[in-house]
């Protein structure tokens, strides 16, 4: 199948070398298509349970979404029932419908049970999915529980259950609240900061002041050590179904609204920090560089797919600083708006890349993207299982970030590099 769609073989060295500037999106679409064919978002159920509970508790502090026959606490009850019934091995589970409904009704009541089943159970998932371009209308990523034959339900394997449940939950809320994605994004920032503080990791959120004392943006998460200043930007937006279906323009728009925008926000602060040696913060303190290394890290709430690595990321960003998207003859209004969003983000990225280069010596062999990391929150939560200080967390994030192993999987690479480090010690 990979050969049929020309996304294989992937040489482990392929992404060391930047693609031609005019073919940057084409190269990225091959990665997206490979992911669509062969990867499914996955996460440790423990991470996902904490994320679902904490994130939506933050979202609903101000108000609640009503009208669907169940409350958020009921959805958490369904999640816990599914998790209790799912096989401990990484395989799917079949369970009698009566058994699941009984457990759920005991937890949330009969009325909420019926409403939840109507909302979350898929009867014929992907019935119209034949080729990757059909992903635009597919529900692959929402398949947590499916109606099966023989009076049974199918429950997704534990590694995939969390992301599927989360995607379905967000999709259901989006039908009732058009601003839910913005609310989730704000809650994600607050939740991640609170999570690290609970673990004892020294960190803070910072509001940066410009030269005239006005707000110049914020840093969602700031970690400092004696050797490193790490600036984090947290983003909710991931890749949309249109991108998964092979729409190159939508890919550019998705990246512009998520990753590229995050890099632009962090780059602005990094440039000011390197130029002035410090950032003035709204709380009256100053963030001083003092010769330390600067790291930029964009953390995504969404899973962008499994098969990207640091080389793909850096080559992508470097191709973007030499790219402008041109309108085709048959763009509709929505596509034209997406094109404008993408080009604005690219223009900002290009100007900041030039400004950054002016701060460096003539012989410098680094650019704006050499210190850039990009991970989803599932991987960060994985690291937080063992890392409880800013120093150890940053060490884990940075180890091997300049290496290309060919795995294109942060979890695999982290395990391999950890094993190698332990052997040496």
Predicted regions and their residues:
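Extended, hydrophobic alpha-helical segments in both membrane/secreted and soluble proteins
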Residues: 192, 217-221, 232
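Active-site beta-strand-loop-beta-strand hairpin of nuclease catalytic cores
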Residues: 223-231, 235-241
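Catalytic cores of nucleic-acid endonucleases
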Residues: 236-297
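Residues that form or immediately flank small-molecule/cofactor binding pockets and catalytic motifs
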Residues: 208, 236, 301
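Active-site metal-binding core of divalent-cation-utilizing nuclease and nuclease-like domains
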Residues: 205-219, 223-226
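Short helix/loop capping segments that flank catalytic or ligand/cofactor-binding pockets
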Residues: 164, 232, 240-242, 307-308
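Flexible loop/turn segments at secondary-structure boundaries
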Residues: 211-217, 238-241, 304-307
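Acidic, metal-dependent phosphodiester-chemistry machinery of nucleic-acid enzymes
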Residues: 1-186, 190-202, 212, 275-425
């Amino acid at each position: 199948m990979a050969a049929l769609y020309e996304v294989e073989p992937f040489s482990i060295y392929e992404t060391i070398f930047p693609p031609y500037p005019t073919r940057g999106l084409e190269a990225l679409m091959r990665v997206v298509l490979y992911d669509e064919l062969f990867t499914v978002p996955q996460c440790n159920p423990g991470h996902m349970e904490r994320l679902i509970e904490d994130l939506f508790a933050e979202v609903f502090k101000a108000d609640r979404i009503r009208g669907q026959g169940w409350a958020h606490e009921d959805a958490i009850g369904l999640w816990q029932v599914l998790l209790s019934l799912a096989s401990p091995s990484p395989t799917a589970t079949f369970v009698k419908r009566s058994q699941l409904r009984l457990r759920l009704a005991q937890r949330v009541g009969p009325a909420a049970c019926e409403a939840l089943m109507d909302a979350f159970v898929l009867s014929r998932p992907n019935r119209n999915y034949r080729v990757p371009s059909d992903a635009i209308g597919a529900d692959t990523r929402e398949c947590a529980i499916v109606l099966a034959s023989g009076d049974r339900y199918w429950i997704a394997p534990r590694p995939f259950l969390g992301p599927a449940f989360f995607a379905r939950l967000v999709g259901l809320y989006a039908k009732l609240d058009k601003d839910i994605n913005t609310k989730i994004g704000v809650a994600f920032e607050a939740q991640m900061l609170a999570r690290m503080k609970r673990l004892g990791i020294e960190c803070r959120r910072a509001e940066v002041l410009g030269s005239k004392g006005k707000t110049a943006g914020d840093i969602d998460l700031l970690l400092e050590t004696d050797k490193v200043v790490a600036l984090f930007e947290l983003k909710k937006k991931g890749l949309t179904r249109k991108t998964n279906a092979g729409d190159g323009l939508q890919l550019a728009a998705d990246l512009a609204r998520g990753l590229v925008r995050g890099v632009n926000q962090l780059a602005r602060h990094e440039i000011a920090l390197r130029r002035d040696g410090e950032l003035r913060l709204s709380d009256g303190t100053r963030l001083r560089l003092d010769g330390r290394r600067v790291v930029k890290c964009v953390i995504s709430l969404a899973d962008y797919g499994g098969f990207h690595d640091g080389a793909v990321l850096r080559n992508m960003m470097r191709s973007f600083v030499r790219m402008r998207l041109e309108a085709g003859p048959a763009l509709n209004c929505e596509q034209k708006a997406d094109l404008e969003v993408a080009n604005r983000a690219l223009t900002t990225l290009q100007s900041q890349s030039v400004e950054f280069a002016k701060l460096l010596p003539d012989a410098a062999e680094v650019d704006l993207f050499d210190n850039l990391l990009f991970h989803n929150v599932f991987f960060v939560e994985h690291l937080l299982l063992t890392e409880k200080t800013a120093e150890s967390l940053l060490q884990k994030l940075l180890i091997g970030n300049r290496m290309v192993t060919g795995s294109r999987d942060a979890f695999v690479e982290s395990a391999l590099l950890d094993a190698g480090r332990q052997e040496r010690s």
